Amino acid sequence: MIVDQNVAFAPAKINLYLHVTGRRSDGYHLLDSLAVFAEACDVLRYRDGDQAAGLGLQLEGPGAETLRAEPDNLVLRAGRALAALAGIKPRGTIMLDKRLPVASGIGGGSSDAAAALRLLSRVWGVSPAAEDLHRIATSLGADVPVCLEPGTYRMRGIGERLEALPAMPEIGLLLANPGVPVSTPEVFRNREHGFTPEATLASRWPDMAALLRDLQLSRNDLQPPAMRLCPAIGILLHALEGLPGARLTRMSGSGATCFTLFDHPDAARDAAQLLQAQSGMGGWCWGGGLYKTASALDKTTL
C-alpha cells in the first residue's frame, strides 16, 4: 500500500560488485553486477495542474543546488515520454526533494526518472505495458530499467538485461560520499585494459555469511581508476574498513559513494553516527537497511 498516491520514493541503487566483462562496437561497456536498493532515497511529490502549463519540476533539498529544472532533466524527459506513449498532454508539477548526492555512483538521477514514471502512471491514470515502460526507461539511461521496481537484481549487458533474484537476508548498509563528484566517462577512460569474467553466484543467500562468500570472490572493476582520479575515495574506504562491525567495504558504481555491509541496520546506523563524529569527515553519510516497499519506509521520510 502506497503511503500517499501523490508521493514516490527514489531509493539509492548500490552495486555490491561490478565486473566490466567486455565492450560493444559502439563503445558501450558490458557489465555484470549485483544491484540492491537502500532505504536512503530522494522523494518525489506531485501537484496537479492545467494541461496548458505542461509538466513542471521544482527542486528542493540538500542536492537541489547542483541540479537545474531544465527540459533535459531526466524526470521531465520521463514524464514527456510517458505522456506521448499514453497519448495525453503532460500536466502538473513534480517537486523533487533531492536528498542523495549527485553524480555519486548510486543511480540517483536514474532512480528519480524511474520514480517519476511510477508516480505519473498512477496520478495520470495510465497503465502502460511493462515492455513499453521498460523501453522508455532504457531510452532514458542504462540504469533506469533496474530502478523501475527496486529489488535485488543481476544486471548484464549495458545494464538493461535484468534478472530478478531472491530477496537478500537482512543486512545493514552504510553509505558515505566524500563530497567530490566523479565523472563516469573519466573513470572508464582510466580503467586498465582487459575484462573480468562474470561472477559465480549462489541461487540464494540464506544469511550474511553466504552473501559474503560470493561477494569476496568479486570486486568493483571501477574502484581502482576512481581512486586514482579521486584519492579521497581511498581515504574514505580506509575509514569505513575500520568501523566496528564492518563486514565488507567497497565503492558503488563509478563512485564516489562507498558502502560498508553490517550484520543489522541498527549496526549500520550506529556506525554512520560514529563516522560523522570523526574529525574531518565531510561529504554525505547514511546508515540503515535495504529498501523493501514504499509503505515499509518510516513515515518520517516524508
UniProtKB/Swiss-Prot annotation:
GO terms for molecular function: 4-(cytidine 5'-diphospho)-2-C-methyl-D-erythritol kinase activity; ATP binding. ATP binds at P101, V102, A103, S104, G105, I106, G107, G108, G109, S110, S111. It comes from the Bacteria. It catalyses: 4-CDP-2-C-methyl-D-erythritol + ATP = 4-CDP-2-C-methyl-D-erythritol 2-phosphate + ADP + H(+). Pfam families: GHMP_kinases_C, GHMP_kinases_N. Its EC number is 2.7.1.148. It is an enzyme of class 2 (transferase). Gene3D superfamilies: 3.30.230.10, GHMP kinase, C-terminal domain. Keywords: ATP-binding, Isoprene biosynthesis, Kinase, Nucleotide-binding, Transferase. The active site is at K13, D143. SUPFAM superfamilies: GHMP Kinase, C-terminal domain (SSF55060), Ribosomal protein S5 domain 2-like (SSF54211). Belongs to the GHMP kinase family. IspE subfamily. Catalyzes the phosphorylation of the position 2 hydroxy group of 4-diphosphocytidyl-2C-methyl-D-erythritol. PANTHER family: 4-DIPHOSPHOCYTIDYL-2-C-METHYL-D-ERYTHRITOL KINASE, CHLOROPLASTIC. This is 4-diphosphocytidyl-2-C-methyl-D-erythritol kinase. It comes from Granulibacter bethesdensis (strain ATCC BAA-1260 / CGDNIH1).
